[in-house]
């Protein structure tokens, strides 16, 4: 959990609102904001014991328009983690979701 706490701190350093998984009903701030959550674990097992464990985490940046400056803020915060990036436009919400997949 310490790794997730560190990630949370790095995401908060962007100045954007940050939440784990989802905002409580009716409490979501206006755009932009960040959401992150654990997708799955990758334990490395040796001699019938977990030798090393990492977690795949999804970090989602939601913006009203394509926002290169905020993407750069997030990418700077994620500098210690290798990431892959995907962009999705959510037409029903009229917003962009920039997805960063990282391993912590």
Enumerate the language-model features and the residues they cover.
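Short intrinsically disordered coil segments
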Residues: 49-54, 75-77
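Short, solvent-exposed beta-strand/turn "edge" segments of beta-rich domains on protein surfaces
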Residues: 47-50, 91
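Small/polar-rich, solvent-exposed N-terminal microdomains that initiate assembly or binding
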Residues: 1-43, 49
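Residues at secondary-structure transition points
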Residues: 46-47, 69
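Acidic-leaning, charged glycine-interspersed low-complexity segments
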Residues: 72-104
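Oligomerization/assembly interface segments of phage tail-like spikes and tubes
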Residues: 53-64, 95-104
């Amino acid at each position: 959990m310490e790794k997730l706490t560190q990630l949370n701190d790095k995401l908060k350093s962007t100045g954007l609102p940050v939440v784990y998984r989802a905002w409580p009903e009716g409490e979501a701030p206006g755009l932009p904001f960040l959401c992150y959550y654990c997708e799955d674990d990758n334990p490395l097992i040796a001699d019938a014991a977990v030798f090393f464990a990492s977690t795949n985490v999804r970090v989602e940046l939601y913006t009203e328009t394509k926002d290169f400056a905020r993407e750069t803020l997030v990418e700077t915060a994620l500098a210690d983690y290798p990431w892959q990036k995907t962009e999705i436009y959510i037409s029903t919400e009229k917003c962009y979701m920039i997805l960063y997949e990282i391993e912590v």
